Amino acid sequence: MSNETVRQAVQKTSRLFESEPGKAKVKTPPVTASLSTGLAFRLSSTRGEIQTDMPPPMGGQASAETPGWYMRAGLASCIATMIATRAAQLGITLDLLEVTILSEVDWRGPLGLDDSVVPATPQAVLSEIVRWGEEHSPVARTIKTGQLAQATINLG
């Protein structure tokens, strides 16, 4: 999709949402995590399926990426999408756009060994368009506000 196509689509959608704000809120398709074996899960939704697992030191088999990896992947792609969208709105053609999300895990927290342990937030110097992309990323906003979603849990 060209920059101009993106710009026109966003412009048209923005006009619609300005005139009819109720149309801006949509329900996302459900995602269901089903236990496969051990700590491996199959996540399925209307558009596909992925697998997760944990590393052996945590009791998994490392047969797939961890849930945290998918969170970082979603955050990186959502921020990149918002940056590209903003650039298109401003008529800027990007020759290169890469977003890298770094994190550090202290496994004492997830294991319940030290509840004060929280992941460190990496420091980065961001340009205005990157800041805008991060602030407007639906994934980043959801994570920051803690309004994750409605969860339905079935045990058996």
Language-model features: locations:
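Extended beta-strand/beta-hairpin segments
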Residues: 1-73, 83-156
